[in-house]
């Protein structure tokens, strides 16, 4: 068995090796290329099908295979690839050959290729067949691209090691595939020839010469097919000759721009990040070859060829292009356009020898004048055809306002080149481009063999050995520190600290980092961000010298003067430490100096004269070495680099020499100097709509008021240069008129999902179930308010979507008219025609017809009324967008731009006019509901509400006529049936009348019945109405029925009996029979009626001819009842079944409703208790202060008021879930008698304790509500290994992907990390009770410093500690009850610190803020203060503004942990522990309206219980202002501009903060004040501002803004006066201090934009249209009044003045401030802090943590005294190692980084198995005991150690990650990381 499995395993491994081998993969890829059929197959197919003789077939096959073999060889052999891939040669070969081939096949008589006696291989036709197949196989990849083979081969070739073997096997696979293909083709052809059915076809037999003609014309058919195919393929590639050329910018412009742009350097990370995404097509590579050009990765033959051509053409090419290169690379700031290079160098030499600059200038100008008249044909042909500087590629023009010339988009962000690292050749992405260029020039000059000889490998071995030694030393030091720690010595000796120079040891003032010699890294110099104007405007001489020195190497090492490449690559050498290639170069220079002869080929320098060459030869070696070093040494002072500091690594960005203007620029006339030039950029379709022209002035376009109207159609051409190549995107299409992106048809079903079965089943079942059960009341309870609001929201949403759909259809029609050529002309004429037809033909003819009709019907005509309405109708000409002009004026260029015709007061034909003296109330209501009385004329003469809208329904002319007719017919029917009724009642009188009279009467009744029947068909409703009005007397009704029935029977018998001769006997029998049947019928009917009435009566009919007088005997009656009973018994089973079902349904519904009803009762009782408490409070309040009451606003009223404020914020759910448990139980506890017995059973339920807050449980336990044995239960946790699931464990993180994407990352990170930075005090148990003392110290420290520095010396240490804690918690979260680390940096607690000692109470573990919903981040909540703290960096409670609506969102305030603080008493007077004392109230950063009055008061209340009392005397500034502008809250992200300097308190602009601090310093602080005392003290405090009292009413009144703002301004005025007088500063005087505050807010900190309100936007546009109309009218009063009546013009917007300040606009709701989400360029440190996610903190935030490191590492023997042992929980007897989770923390951060890099990147074993061997083997866990040297391990399960991952976050490799993100991550810019490669922490090794 073992042997078999061994054999099987070997077999499997052997098969895997064979499958993965290079040969098999090559064969597979080669075989695949068989299916890559291109145009080259046409010749092979033609030869196999049509050619006669084996020679031609053999030659075709040979040529085909030879061409493919050349292609495979060219993949590996670069020169052949260059030769084949050069577009010039291929073009030169292909175009004449195609012409020749076409000519050959169509004019064969020019060539005699008949059979000769010579050798057949010399036959021209056979050679042509060979050439056809060979050349077109080569064409297939370049002119006629087939991408499958190239992609597959290149992808694998890049990965493959043995490239020759792969290419060979690929060719063999291709050969096998094609042999099989040709064999199969031959078999098919033989089968066709031999198939009898094909040959015996009737059509073929009838046309004898059909096959012959087909064979003769096959050559032409193939040539036509080939031509069509070539045109199709070439259509994707723009012809280089036919491409639209662009004119270069004028010389003066270039000179100015070159001066402006010379020293400008753009950081590639920010400026170039979007360029890669803008490139499209398949040929948009870099035209400048990179140093890794001949590697197999992504190079293009086109760009190589451009480079080669420039080399070949040498001097002439450089003449014309040198100026543009100087301009692009920034070397030129004099007018050197078209200056030849040899002049440049001659002048340089002369200038070097003589120093005479003027001679140089004169020489330049002379040479320029000489060359001005040179003709264009001096340029070579290739330069004319293929100019790399032309826009003949699919580039979009990225316009930069600072630099008018565009950046060349094909330049890369990074520079890649190979260098040696650790003795291995590696690709570096931050290689200095200048060094690469220089090294390339040296390699060209010196043979490769000599370079290899002169570069020994000693440096590499030395480099590796030193690195190993350093790594070993670091590991030893690390382990030594760990051993000392195991020996339980003092921990402060173990920690590695950073040494810094200190000015004052007591104050801990350090030397600035920039001047600290003990620091290294980026602090040692300033970073030069840009170049000042003074440096730019240096003298000509200095710039010239600088440029000359930069070009020294160029003059020495460049044989062919490839200026095009050099000017792009010769950047200034970067300030990075030089890599190993510099060292290699230095050794090379030394060897050159020691040689007797220089190995440089100086004779090859073509630009030197002989005299100069001799002088160069005679130079001394030392001079040569100095000369080279002067040229390349970046630190030489003579090189013109006078600025001190570190220059950032950046590239000179090349620019195009063209200035391109868009179509819109040309229309707007912005570039008047280039008005004659046609636009070169395609812009978005737009129209310039002139809405007003000042006719009095000249025709200056500035006197016109114009709007730009953009087309909303999908336009994927915009931004593309005219004549540029389009993208070679196949399989893409545009399916909609408005489409954001181009989609592939493969994914159409995913884009538009099928909605056939997507319906809500519950919505369908609910009405059926409701009707079945008939229980409406229960369903009313079941359907809560939420469902009602949801339904209403759904209706509103559907309505909005419907309107949106209609709007899109309208826009689609508008765009369609725009796109169709000549459509506007046709439409304009049609509209004018329809307007004339309507006004002068159609409407007058209708008026005439109507009045003639009235005259025919003998009614008065209404000529005057109709003509008056007809005259009232106005047809106003409007622009295409609906801007009104006048009745007579036509828009400018209306035939081209389009026209609209707006009809004011449209005429509607009415059948009659109602007198207007006394209009009825219904008409008045109709007028109110009526829409605006205007419409737009459509092309078909219809009326539409909006331009291009759907035609509206016009009121019908005949509808009121029909209604009137119906009324009259109804009246007639009523009268008619009343007469019928009277006649029917009097039929009794006709009993004694003779039979003849009866007969006549019966006939008349029959006739009337027919009429009645017909009328009932016409209008049955009226008939039934009259039927219901019947006699009330039932017996009378029954008698009448019997009488009429008997009359009918008698008539029946008489009519029938008239036909018999002896009718007396028969007549009597039939009479008896009819009597009997009628009696039975009457009995049945009477019984049914009696059953209904339950009053049995026996009706004795006297009109019987037989002797039976009493048929209704009881016996008969009981028989009928018996039959009924049998029927009931038969159906009893079904009755029972139905009854049981109904019973079940009732029970089921009642069970469902029980929890709903109980919760409702509970909430109602809670509400009553709360309201009772509030009413008591308010009664007391009124007794003390006679002020207006504020009613408690419960959640429902909040919801209602918010709904009234704005229906736009329909996603606000003020649900009862927002009420925290703390709030509810606090209100319950405040009742006079605590009677919670009714809740005892609920609270004692087993699962309840899992969901109640811990401190609430403790509180109720003391009250005796909870059982004492009920412990703090935790929900069961499951072992999940992954980080995602750990996050998902906290429900706040468990969101859908869409909602995650809507989160603002910075806000969420900010909120999450607020608790991480909390103060770290109260370490000792002895200091646990000294709250006030510590708070006062902390309070003073915080207020002493104005601006905080970036960080103190412990910031990084604490940051790394928290970082390690987070990493640990992600692994060991399951054992939360056993490990000490019960608090995580993700928690947000009541401003308690993250306790680093051992507070082991279970309830503190990961106590996520249950009610701080993540919804806060997903929407802008319109509640007063709900989002006040969202953008704070820290969870700083001093700036949280509590209000009524916020209590439901913050639950952390009632966490009174008796276990952790035994001295805290839970009573009425001690509600809350406050561990931070702030000025002006803990929760309210207030504006003291009267600081002097505040100073007089002896007491200052800092805190009312959780802010729950309804009136708080000091309201914050922002509490008023942001109520109306919730968008302001988003602006608190101050990190966008000044991230680390501005402290939190300065963001709130309370300018008198310091004064208030001084006033309040010596006052008694009342910390724990109950609500009753608070009420008493309130009378002594500052008066409450009216804005707080009026807040509730303001909400319901939809925000009455003015009183609040006016009061707010008065408050602020006092504040500003106070601050101005005390500080003595001269401030800008504002009209309103709100404006001053706003100005400070906007000017100093934030990027912002002013956005119109949505509702205002539409109103403003309507106003603009009306204004445009009024400006043109002579007497605009009438139109103005009618516009106001029709609500077209909004008067509140009309009142906006020109000088209205910003605050007034905001008060009116006109403008809303919102931030601009711009990418702001940050320095590297800021990006690092952002990426880490646990950011640095302000200095003041950690000043209370001075004891941090002294108390953190204490002696382990005394460790237990720091462990807090709770009263009711188990005592933690285990000693806790709280810092040994992350052993690296012993080292300092810089050394830690070094340890990680060395241990990871220097790892010799790079395989996954070797790397993770520590963790994959359980037995190796004991090796970690050196870190955790304990008798008892901290962990329960050793396997958890396997999950001990240490993340390689980019805080130490940020620059590498930012550069490598294009390869490691799926992003194109360095601003975000989509994924990080996380590696296991490697095992420490000591060699």
From Swiss-Prot:
Q: Where is this region: Disordered?
A: 248-300, 786-805, 1569-1603
Report any Pfam family annotated for this entry. Ycf1
Q: How does it sit in the membrane?
A: Multi-pass membrane protein
Intracellular or extracellular location(s): Plastid, Chloroplast inner membrane
User: Mind telling me which residue stretches traverse the membrane in this protein?
Assistant: 18-38, 64-84, 87-107, 124-144, 172-192, 221-241
**Gene Ontology BP term (one):** protein transport
Q: Which InterPro entries match?
A: TIC214 (IPR008896)
What segments bear the compositional bias annotation Basic and acidic residues? 1578-1597
* The keyword Transmembrane helix is assigned to this record: yes
Q: Which residues form a coiled coil?
A: 775-816
> Looking at the UniProt record for this protein, which Gene Ontology cellular component terms does it annotate, in alphabetical order?
chloroplast inner membrane
The UniProt keywords, alphabetically, are: Chloroplast, Coiled coil, Membrane, Plastid, Plastid inner membrane, Protein transport, Transmembrane, Transmembrane helix, Transport
| Chief location bin | plastid
Compositionally skewed regions (Acidic residues) per UniProt:
256-268
What binding partners and quaternary form does the record give?
A: Part of the Tic complex.
Q: Which function does this protein serve?
A: Involved in protein precursor import into chloroplasts. May be part of an intermediate translocation complex acting as a protein-conducting channel at the inner envelope.
Family named by the database record = Belongs to the TIC214 family.
Write down what this protein is called: Protein TIC 214
Organism classification: Eukaryota, Viridiplantae, Streptophyta, Embryophyta, Tracheophyta
Q: Which gene encodes it?
A: TIC214
């Amino acid at each position: 068995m073992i042997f078999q499995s061994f054999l099987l395993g070997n077999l499997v491994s052997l098969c895997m090796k064979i499958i993965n081998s290079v040969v098999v993969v090559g064969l597979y890829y080669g075989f695949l290329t068989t299916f890559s059929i291109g145009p080259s197959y046409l010749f092979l197919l033609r030869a196999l099908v049509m050619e006669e003789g084996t020679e031609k077939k053999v030659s075709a096959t040979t040529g085909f295979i030879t061409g493919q073999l050349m292609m495979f060889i060219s993949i590996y052999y670069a020169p052949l690839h260059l030769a084949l891939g050069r577009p010039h040669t291929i073009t030169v070969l292909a175009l004449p050959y195609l012409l020749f081939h076409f000519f050959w096949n169509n004019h064969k008589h020019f060539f005699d290729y008949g059979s000769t006696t010579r050798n057949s291989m010399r036959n021209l036709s056979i050679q042509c067949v060979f050439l056809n197949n060979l050349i077109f196989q080569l064409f297939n990849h370049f002119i006629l691209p087939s991408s499958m083979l190239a992609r597959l081969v290149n992808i694998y070739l890049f990965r493959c090691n043995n490239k020759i073997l792969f290419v060979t096997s690929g060719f063999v696979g291709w050969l096998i595939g094609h042999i099989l293909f040709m064999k199969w083709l031959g078999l098919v052809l033989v089968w066709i020839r031999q198939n009898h059915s094909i040959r015996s076809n009737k059509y073929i037999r009838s046309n004898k010469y059909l096959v012959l003609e087909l064979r003769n014309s096959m050559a032409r058919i193939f040539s036509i097919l080939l031509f069509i195919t070539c045109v199709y393929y070439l259509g994707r590639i723009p012809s280089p000759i036919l491409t639209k050329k662009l004119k270069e910018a004028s010389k003066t412009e270039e000179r100015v721009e070159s001066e402006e742009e010379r020293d400008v350097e753009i950081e590639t990370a920010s400026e170039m990040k979007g360029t890669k995404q803008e490139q499209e097509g398949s040929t948009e590579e870099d035209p400048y070859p990179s140093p890794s050009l001949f590697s197999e990765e992504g190079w293009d033959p086109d760009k190589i060829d451009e480079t080669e051509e420039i080399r070949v053409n040498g001097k002439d090419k450089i003449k014309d292009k040198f100026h543009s290169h100087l301009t692009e690379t920034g070397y030129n700031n004099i007018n050197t356009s078209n200056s030849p290079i040899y002049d440049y160098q001659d002048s340089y030499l002369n200038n070097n020898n003589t120093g005479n600059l003027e001679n140089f200038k004169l020489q330049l100008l002379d040479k320029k004048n000489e060359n001005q008249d040179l003709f264009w044909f001096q340029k070579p042909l290739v330069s004319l055809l293929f100019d790399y500087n032309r826009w003949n590629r699919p580039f979009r023009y990225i316009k930069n306002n600072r630099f008018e010339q565009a950046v060349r988009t094909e330049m890369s962000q990074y520079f890649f080149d190979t260098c040696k690292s650790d003795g291995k050749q590696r690709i570096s992405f931050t290689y200095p481009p200048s060094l690469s260029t220089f090294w390339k020039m040296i390699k060209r000059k010196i043979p490769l063999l000599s370079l290899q000889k002169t570069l020994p490998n000693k440096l590499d071995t030395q480099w590796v050995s030193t690195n190993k030694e350093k790594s070993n030393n670091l590991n030893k030091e690390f382990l030594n520190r760990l051993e000392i720690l195991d020996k339980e010595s003092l921990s402060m000796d173990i920690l590695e600290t950073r040494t810094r120079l200190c000015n004052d040891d007591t104050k801990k003032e350090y030397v600035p980092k920039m001047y600290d010699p003990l620091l290294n890294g980026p602090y040692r110099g300033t970073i030069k961000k840009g170049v000042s104007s003074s440096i730019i405007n240096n003298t000509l001489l200095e710039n010239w010298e600088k440029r000359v020195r930069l070009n020294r190497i160029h003059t020495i090492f460049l044989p062919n003067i490839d200026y095009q490449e050099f000017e792009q690559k010769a950047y200034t050498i970067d300030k990075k430490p030089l890599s190993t290639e510099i060292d290699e170069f230095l050794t090379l220079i030394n060897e050159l100096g020691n040689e007797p002869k220089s190995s440089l080929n100086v004779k090859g320098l073509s630009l030197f004269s002989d005299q100069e060459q001799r002088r160069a030869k005679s130079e001394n070696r030392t001079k040569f070495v100095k000369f080279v070093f002067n040229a390349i040494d970046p630190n030489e002072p003579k090189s013109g680099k006078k600025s001190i500091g570190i220059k950032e690594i950046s590239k000179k960005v090349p620019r195009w020499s063209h200035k391109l203007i868009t179509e819109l620029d040309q229309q707007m006339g912005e570039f008047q100097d280039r008005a004659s030039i046609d636009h070169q950029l395609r812009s978005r379709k737009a129209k310039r709509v002139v809405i007003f022209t000042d006719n009095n002035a000249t025709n200056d376009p500035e006197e016109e008021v114009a709007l730009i109207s953009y087309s909303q159609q999908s336009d994927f051409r915009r931004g593309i240069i005219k004549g540029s190549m389009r993208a070679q995107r196949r399989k893409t299409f545009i399916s909609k008129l408005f489409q954001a992106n181009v989609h592939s048809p493969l994914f159409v079903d995913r884009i538009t999902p099928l909605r056939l079965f997507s319906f809500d089943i519950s919505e369908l079942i609910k009405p059926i179930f409701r009707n079945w059960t008939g229980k409406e009341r229960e369903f009313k309870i079941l359907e809560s308010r939420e469902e009602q609001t949801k339904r209403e929201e759904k209706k509103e949403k559907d309505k909005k979507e419907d309107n949106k759909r209609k709007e899109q259809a309208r826009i689609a029609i508008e765009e369609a008219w725009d796109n169709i050529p000549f459509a506007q002309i046709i439409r304009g004429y049609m509209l004018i025609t329809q307007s004339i037809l309507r006004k002068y033909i159609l409407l007058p003819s209708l008026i005439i017809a109507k009045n003639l009709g009235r005259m025919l019907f003998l009614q008065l005509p209404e000529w005057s009324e109709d003509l008056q309405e007809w005259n009232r109708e106005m047809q106003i000409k409007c622009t295409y967008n609906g801007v009104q002009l006048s009745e007579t004026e036509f828009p400018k260029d209306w035939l081209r731009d389009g026209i609209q015709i707006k009809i004011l007061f449209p005429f509607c034909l009415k059948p009659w006019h109602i007198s207007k003296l006394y209009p009825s109330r219904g008409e008045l209501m109709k007028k109110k509901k009526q829409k605006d009385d205007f419409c737009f004329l459509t092309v078909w003469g219809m009326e539409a509400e909006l331009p291009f809208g759907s035609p509206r329904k016009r009121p019908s002319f005949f509808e009121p006529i029909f209604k009137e007719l119906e009324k009259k017919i109804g009246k007639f029917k009523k009268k008619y049936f009343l007469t019928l009724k009277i006649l029917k009642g009097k039929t009794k009188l006709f009993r004694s009348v003779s039979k003849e009279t009866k007969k006549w009467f019966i006939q008349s009744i029959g006739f009337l019945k027919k009429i009645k029947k017909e009328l009932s068909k016409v209008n049955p409703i009226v008939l039934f109405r009259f039927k219901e009005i019947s006699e009330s007397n039932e017996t009378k009704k029954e008698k009448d029925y019997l009488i009429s029935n008997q009359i009918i029977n008698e008539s029946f018998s008489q009519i029938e009996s008239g036909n018999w001769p002896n009718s007396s006997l028969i007549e009597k029998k039939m009479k008896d029979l009819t009597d009997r049947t009628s009696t039975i019928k009457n009995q049945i009917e009477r019984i049914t009626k009696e059953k209904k009435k339950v009053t049995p009566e026996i009706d004795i009919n006297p009109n019987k001819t037989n002797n039976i007088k009493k048929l209704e005997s009881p016996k008969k009656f009981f028989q009928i009842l018996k039959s009924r009973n049998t029927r009931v018994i038969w159906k009893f089973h079904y009755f029972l079944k139905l009854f049981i079902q109904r019973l079940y349904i009732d029970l089921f519904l009642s069970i469902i409703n029980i929890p709903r009803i109980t919760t409702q009762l509970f909430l109602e009782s809670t509400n009553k208790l709360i309201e009772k408490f509030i009413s008591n409070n308010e009664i007391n309040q009124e007794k003390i202060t006679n002020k207006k009451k504020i009613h408690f606003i419960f959640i429902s009223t909040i919801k209602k008021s918010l709904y009234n404020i704005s229906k736009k914020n329909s996603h606000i759910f003020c649900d009862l879930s927002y009420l925290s448990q703390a709030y509810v139980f606090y209100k319950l506890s405040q009742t006079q008698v605590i009677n919670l017995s009714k809740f005892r059973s609920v609270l004692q339920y087993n699962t309840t304790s899992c969901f109640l807050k811990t401190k609430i449980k403790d509180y109720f336990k003391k009250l005796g509500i909870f059982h004492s044995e009920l412990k703090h239960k935790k929900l069961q946790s499951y072992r999940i290994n992954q980080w995602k699931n750990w996050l998902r464990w906290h429900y706040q993180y468990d969101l859908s992907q869409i909602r995650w994407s809507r989160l603002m990352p910075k806000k969420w990170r900010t909120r999450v990390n607020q608790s991480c930075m909390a103060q770290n005090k109260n370490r000792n148990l002895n200091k646990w009770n000294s709250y006030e003392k510590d708070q006062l110290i902390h309070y003073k420290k915080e207020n002493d410093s104005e601006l905080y520095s970036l960080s103190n010396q412990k910031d990084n240490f604490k940051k790394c500690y928290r970082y390690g804690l987070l990493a640990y918690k992600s692994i060991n979260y399951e054992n939360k009850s056993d490990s000490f680390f019960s608090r995580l940096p993700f928690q947000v607690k009541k401003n308690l610190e993250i306790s680093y000692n051992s507070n082991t109470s279970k309830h503190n573990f990961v106590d996520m803020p249950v009610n701080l919903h993540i919804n806060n981040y997903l929407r802008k909540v319109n509640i007063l203060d709900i989002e006040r703290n969202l953008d704070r960096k820290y969870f700083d409670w001093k700036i949280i503004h509590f209000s009524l609506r916020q209590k439901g969102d913050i639950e952390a305030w009632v966490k009174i942990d008796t276990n952790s603080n035994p001295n805290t008493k839970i009573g009425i007077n001690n509600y809350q522990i406050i561990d931070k004392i702030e000025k002006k109230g803990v929760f309210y950063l207030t504006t003291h309206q009267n600081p002097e009055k505040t100073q007089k008061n002896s007491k200052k209340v800092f805190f009312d219980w959780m802010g729950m009392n309804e009136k708080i005397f000091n309201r914050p500034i922002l509490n008023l202002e942001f109520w109306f502008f919730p968008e302001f809250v988003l602006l608190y992200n101050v990190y966008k501009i000044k991230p680390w300097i501005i402290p939190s308190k300065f963001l709130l602009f309370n300018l008198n903060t310091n004064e208030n601090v001084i006033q309040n310093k010596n006052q008694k602080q009342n910390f724990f004040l109950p609500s009753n005392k608070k009420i008493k003290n309130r009378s002594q405090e500052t008066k409450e501002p009216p804005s707080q009292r009026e807040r509730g009413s303001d909400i319901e009144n939809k925000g009455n803004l003015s009183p609040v703002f006016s009061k707010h301004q008065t408050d602020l005025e006092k504040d500003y006066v106070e601050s101005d007088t005390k500080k003595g500063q001269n401030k800008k005087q504002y009209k309103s201090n709100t404006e001053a505050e706003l100005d400070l807010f906007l000017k100093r900190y934030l990027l912002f934009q002013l956005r119109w309100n949505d509702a205002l936007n539409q109103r403003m546009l309507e106003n603009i249209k009306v204004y445009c109309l009024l400006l043109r009218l002579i007497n605009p009063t009438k139109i103005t009044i009618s516009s106001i009546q029709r609500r077209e013009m909004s008067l509140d917007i009309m009142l906006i003045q020109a000088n209205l300040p910003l605050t007034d606009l905001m008060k009116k709701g006109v403008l809303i401030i919102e931030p601009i989400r711009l990418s702001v360029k940050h320095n590297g440190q800021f990006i690092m802090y952002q990426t880490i996610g646990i950011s640095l903190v302000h200095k003041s935030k950690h000043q209370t943590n001075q004891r941090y490191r002294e108390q953190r590492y204490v002696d382990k023997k005394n460790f237990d005294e720091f462990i807090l042992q709770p009263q009711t929980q188990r005592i933690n007897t285990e000693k806790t190692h709280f810092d040994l989770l992350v052993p690296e923390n012993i080292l300092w951060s810089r050394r830690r980084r070094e340890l990680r890099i060395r241990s990871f990147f220097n790892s010799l074993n790079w395989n996954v198995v070797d790397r993770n061997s520590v963790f994959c083997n359980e037995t190796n866990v004991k090796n970690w005991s050196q870190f955790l040297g304990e008798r008892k391990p901290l962990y329960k399960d050793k396997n958890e150690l396997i999950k001990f991952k240490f993340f390689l976050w980019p805080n130490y490799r940020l620059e590498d990650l930012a550069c490598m993100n294009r390869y490691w991550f799926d992003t194109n810019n360095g601003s975000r990381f989509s994924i990080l490669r996380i590696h296991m922490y490697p095992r420490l090794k000591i060699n």
